[in-house]
Amino acid sequence: MNKQDYIDGAESALLHTYNRFPLVIDHGDGVYLYDTDGKEYLDFAAGIAVQAFGYNNKEYNDALKAQIDKVMHTSNLYYNVPIMNAAKRVLKASQMNRVFFTNSGTEAIEGAIKAAKKYAYTRDGHAGHEIIAMNHSFHGRSIGALSVTGNKHYQEPFEPLLPGVKFADFNDLDSVKALINDKTCAIIFETVQGEGGIYHATEAFIKGVRALCDEHDILLILDEIQCGMGRTGEMFAWQHYGVKPDIMTSAKALGCGVPVGAFLMTERVAEKSLAPGDHGTTYGGNPFVGAAVDKVLEMMERDHITEHVKKVAPYLEKKLDELVAKYDFLTERRGMGLMQGVVCEKPVGQIAAKALEAGLIVITAGSNVLRFVPPLIIEEKDVDEMISRLESIL
């Protein structure tokens, strides 16, 4: 079969929910992917910020193979050792107290919403509470996650969504204050907006929201699904600001390719929120994903991944700034660490598609931002190679 045969086969069998690039990936190694024709691609997308250690990492692979040979799934009717080890590591890294493992980031958001609502229900003795989310945010595509996603394009066909969700403007504290009332139980936002165009929270905003939450007994939920797990130079992006959420979500690089997410909370929230029967999952937190999360966090801590990101990220920023200065149609770079975006005057889909011809994988964030979320193991030479390949098609 040739590449087109694979594409035609997929198009005839899979539900058409993605506008895929005409690329059939066969395997990967390090920071490179290879298609079924053997062509090499430098990957600066990392499976949308998932493959923190790149591809075909032997230590990670061996850990998963060993767990497959023991047991992959047992259900949550019983305890298992790998998920206990994973829980201890993620709680240490996040400074949180309790964790629930899910199968995806979207599921983590659903759990966080339920935990916030149950907390308020336990406190007040009644339901009907509200959540404040942000315009231009993205939290997932299930009904609950979609309800707090601030983009009408995604929401409109599926309305009515969850009631009681109001939208403020990201980094506008006054717009948040204006929406708070005695029904507000939570404020949710991404510490660094991804799909919304790579905007990070200002220090004044995130500290201001934390203060409002403390004043009104509102829970602060921070979505760290894309920006967490070392990507910004701290294990979680909120750790740059000296504030702490009441609930946070994680996924993507948490499993480095294995489908896993998590929502974490403080002991104060855990004591008043989800109890037996309130939430559950069949697959979530099974021994296989536990082994993956445990190994990922072990490697990140041992190999000082956040320190490496702090070292290489300024070089990526410098080279992207030079690119913006060189081309009139590129107007701005923004981001934190190895989560960067370059703004273009026109839609960037054509640039991402054209980059594939040069053996480079980059993706978009919204319609006019080119997104760079490479594996966290990249070196300066990889940045140079990326710039060279990108400039060849600009």
Regions found by a protein language model. Name each.
Residues M1-L394:
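Conserved N-terminal phosphate-binding loop of PLP-dependent enzymes in the Aspartate aminotransferase
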